[in-house]
Amino acid sequence: MSDFGINLDAICDNVRRNSSNSSIKSQVSNRSSRKMDFVDEDELSTYFNSKTSVTQSDSCSNDLNVKHSIIAEAVVCDESAHVSADAVQEKDVVVPKMDESVMKWMMDSHDGICVNGGLNFSKLKNKSNEHETKVTSETNVSAHVSAGINSQLGMFNPIQHKIKKEAIPEMFEDEDTDECTCRNCPYKEKYLKLRKKLKNVLVDIITEM
């Protein structure tokens, strides 16, 4: 009877070899059996060219044209509110308005300045007596400026004007008379300075028109 020997080293090598081959085969079979999902080119193009979903960081394309189009078409969002800058944002338009106190002063002023669809400058020379006020002479210098005043913008929109430059000084020729009732008023000096400044502004406006 012959000796029957078992080579354990050879068996171990075969087991290791078979196990490694089986693991490789299983990995290959798993890879081959796995469903390969590819991205549709139309959907990808739609994504990259969509302003609602693309940001400036989505510039990973290797195609320079696509990359530049992504950056150019990317939406700029607010960091806090994430609001698209492409959306129409309504802004409150600030409408400049004349102060009511200035308006009232112009309406009630004895200088004859009134605003009623235009600027009408009329001047009356008044002389006061002790018992009565008598109008000795009346000088009506009417510089009617037909100006379209846009109430919304609060600006002068000159349409037409009829005035001579040499007639401008005549409007204010008797402004600085001392015959007014407020000659002893402590604010008279300040009032005269302010009135003179307003006159200069009005003269400049009329001259420029």
Curated annotation (Swiss-Prot):
<keyword id="KW-0694">RNA-binding</keyword>
<dbReference type="GO" id="GO:0030430">
    <property type="term" value="C:host cell cytoplasm"/>
</dbReference>
<dbReference type="GO" id="GO:0000287">
    <property type="term" value="F:magnesium ion binding"/>
</dbReference>
<comment type="similarity">
    <text>Belongs to the rotavirus NSP5 family.</text>
</comment>
<protein>
    <recommendedName>
        <fullName>Non-structural protein 5</fullName>
    </recommendedName>
</protein>
<dbReference type="GO" id="GO:0000166">
    <property type="term" value="F:nucleotide binding"/>
</dbReference>
<keyword id="KW-1035">Host cytoplasm</keyword>
<dbReference type="Pfam" id="PF01525">
    <property type="entry name" value="Rota_NS26"/>
</dbReference>
<comment type="subunit">
    <text>Homodimer. Interacts with VP1. Interacts with VP2. Interacts with NSP2 and NSP6.</text>
</comment>
<dbReference type="GO" id="GO:0019079">
    <property type="term" value="P:viral genome replication"/>
</dbReference>
<keyword id="KW-0547">Nucleotide-binding</keyword>
<dbReference type="InterPro" id="IPR002512">
    <property type="entry name" value="Rotavirus_A/C_NSP5"/>
</dbReference>
<dbReference type="GO" id="GO:0003723">
    <property type="term" value="F:RNA binding"/>
</dbReference>
<keyword id="KW-0479">Metal-binding</keyword>
<keyword id="KW-0325">Glycoprotein</keyword>
<comment type="function">
    <text>Plays an essential role in the viral genome replication. Participates, together with NSP2, in the formation of viral factories (viroplasms) which are large inclusions in the host cytoplasm where replication intermediates are assembled and viral RNA replication takes place. Orchestrates the recruitment of viroplasmic proteins such as capsid proteins to these factories.</text>
</comment>
<dbReference type="GO" id="GO:0016887">
    <property type="term" value="F:ATP hydrolysis activity"/>
</dbReference>
<keyword id="KW-0460">Magnesium</keyword>
<feature type="binding site">
    <location>
        <position position="86"/>
    </location>
    <ligand>
        <name>Mg(2+)</name>
    </ligand>
</feature>
